[in-house]
């Protein structure tokens, strides 16, 4: 299939398997959940009754005081007591093999292309890293203001000019992930990045 560039009359040939694949929502959901789970730090730690310091002595005798029975001042029922089901450091990583991951990316790119949220441009260039210049470039092409820009390699002027905008993310091809692709309203890809994506996923 061919994709039309927005800012020129040129077209580029791309693989059907990458930009015209079937939409597989269960697979995309699984891969996105796994990606976000893998990004979790997993270092939370709490102490159980056994790990909290103190509490070795029975606070008062079992009978005769009129008070409720108590065996430790570190009971989970007490203030400063231990946690009943204490959280411990753990890994949240979910296994997703390479074929599934790439298939999910192809499905996302294909759906974005079908519904008009995928935009290919010949090139995106700024002569200076100014937010005003970047906004003018986006307005000239009517791209909107909720954007993911994908470049073939790090474009320092585009990155610096856009980093003050809360709904704009600029990445290179190596940083592509399913969560980012779905987060933004439109995905803008330059020609060099599009060729690299096509080669990578086809």
UniProtKB/Swiss-Prot annotation:
> What GO terms in the biological process aspect are recorded for it?
translation
Q: Which domain of life is it from?
A: Bacteria
Name the SUPFAM superfamilies on file: Ribosomal protein L4
InterPro entries per UniProt: Ribosomal_uL4, Ribosomal_uL4-like, Ribosomal_uL4_dom_sf
Determine if Ion transport is one of this entry's keywords: no
The UniProt record lists the keyword DNA repair: no
Keywords from the named record: Ribonucleoprotein, Ribosomal protein, RNA-binding, rRNA-binding
Q: Which Gene3D superfamilies match?
A: 3.40.1370.10
Q: Which Gene Ontology cellular-component terms appear in the entry?
A: ribonucleoprotein complex; ribosome
Q: Which GO terms describe its molecular function?
A: rRNA binding; structural constituent of ribosome
Q: Where is this region: Disordered?
A: 47-67
Similarity comment text for this entry = Belongs to the universal ribosomal protein uL4 family.
Subunit structure, per the record?
Part of the 50S ribosomal subunit.
Q: What does this protein do?
A: One of the primary rRNA binding proteins, this protein initially binds near the 5'-end of the 23S rRNA. It is important during the early stages of 50S assembly. It makes multiple contacts with different domains of the 23S rRNA in the assembled 50S subunit and ribosome. Forms part of the polypeptide exit tunnel.
Protein's name according to its UniProt entry: Large ribosomal subunit protein uL4
What's the source species for this entry? Answer: Dichelobacter nodosus (strain VCS1703A)
């Amino acid at each position: 299939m061919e994709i039309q560039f927005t800012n020129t009359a040129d077209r580029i040939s791309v693989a059907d398997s990458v930009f015209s694949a079937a939409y597989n929502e269960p697979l995309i959901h699984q891969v996105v959940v796994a990606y976000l789970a893998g990004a979790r730090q997993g270092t939370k730690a709490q102490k159980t009754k056994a790990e909290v310091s103190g509490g070795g002595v029975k606070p008062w005798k079992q009978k005769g005081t009129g008070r409720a029975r108590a065996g430790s001042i570190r009971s989970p029922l007490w203030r400063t007591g231990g946690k009943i089901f204490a959280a411990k450091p753990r890994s949240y990583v979910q296994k997703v093999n390479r074929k599934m991951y790439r298939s999910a990316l192809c499905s996302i790119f294909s759906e974005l292309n079908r519904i008009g949220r995928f935009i290919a441009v010949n090139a995106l260039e700024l002569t200076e890293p100014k937010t005003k210049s970047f906004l003018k470039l986006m307005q000239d092409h009517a791209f909107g203001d909720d954007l993911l820009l994908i470049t073939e390699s790090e474009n320092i002027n585009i990155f610096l000019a856009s980093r003050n905008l809360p709904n704009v993310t600029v990445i290179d091809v190596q940083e592509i992930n399913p969560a980012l692709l779905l987060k933004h309203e439109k995905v803008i890809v330059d020609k060099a990045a599009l060729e690299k994506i096509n080669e990578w996923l086809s």
